[in-house]
Regions:
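Active-site beta-strand termini and strand-to-loop segments that position acidic
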Residues: 18, 162, 203
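Residue "hotspots" at secondary-structure boundaries inside conserved domains
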Residues: 116, 152-153
Length: 205
């Protein structure tokens, strides 16, 4: 265990300073010491954390987890569950209108083959969760995660959103992002369509 400084709290997540970096760690990984958290109130003291990671380490975890899913089919409502006959049927029951519209026809070709199911925000939620970071399930939740940054200042790990909040991907540098794009397509790394992107949020800060 190593000592870290708690600087904030959001639900079951602590915002901490660790090795000159700031990030979020779930309370399950925090062991409170003297001058740390007392009776649920923050005192700004130090405590210890098991497995705390820096922002750069968190980004590597998130990026590598998402990169491993490149080629997985886009599935409306998918949030990282394995794409099986049962899971696809459950999605069809949850989203009957989308199923009737044909949203799941493409995905049916990939069931029971070891693929995970992702829509755009599902990929982001799942990827960040691999580093213990909660950003919410939908684009409408994720647009409130972290802090707003200018598009001219984006850095790897930032979330990029379309103007209507209908799509989200993660910037990975060199004008590229990783996304689960749309029905009939796949998780992929591609050039950022900057004319389509209107907002950015920095979760790793």
């Amino acid at each position: 265990n190593e000592a870290v400084e708690i600087v904030g709290e959001e639900g079951s997540w602590y915002k901490i300073n660790y090795k000159n970096s700031t990030g979020y760690v779930h309370s399950d990984y925090i062991q409170v010491g003297t001058g740390g958290v007392s009776n649920g109130n923050l005192s700004g003291g130090t405590t210890s954390v098991s497995g705390a990671i820096s922002n750069s380490e968190a980004y590597n975890i998130v990026f590598n987890a998402m990169k491993e899913q490149v080629g997985a089919p886009y599935v409306w409502g998918g949030s990282g569950e394995y794409l099986t006959t049962n899971s696809l049927n459950e999605l069809k029951l949850r989203f009957p209108e989308d199923a009737a519209y044909g949203e799941y026809i493409h995905a049916e070709n990939y069931v029971n083959q070891g693929y995970r199911a992702f829509d755009c925000s599902g990929l982001m939620q799942w990827g960040f969760a691999q580093a213990g970071i909660s950003i919410g399930r939908t684009t409408y939740s994720q647009i409130n995660a972290g802090v707003e940054v200018q598009l001219s200042s984006v850095q790897p790990g930032d979330l990029l959103f379309s103007a209507d909040l209908g799509h989200v991907g993660m910037y990975i540098g060199d004008n590229q992002w990783i996304e689960s794009s749309y029905t009939g397509d796949y998780v992929r790394i591609s050039n950022v369509p900057w004319s389509y992107v209107s907002r950015a949020r920095r979760v790793l800060n």
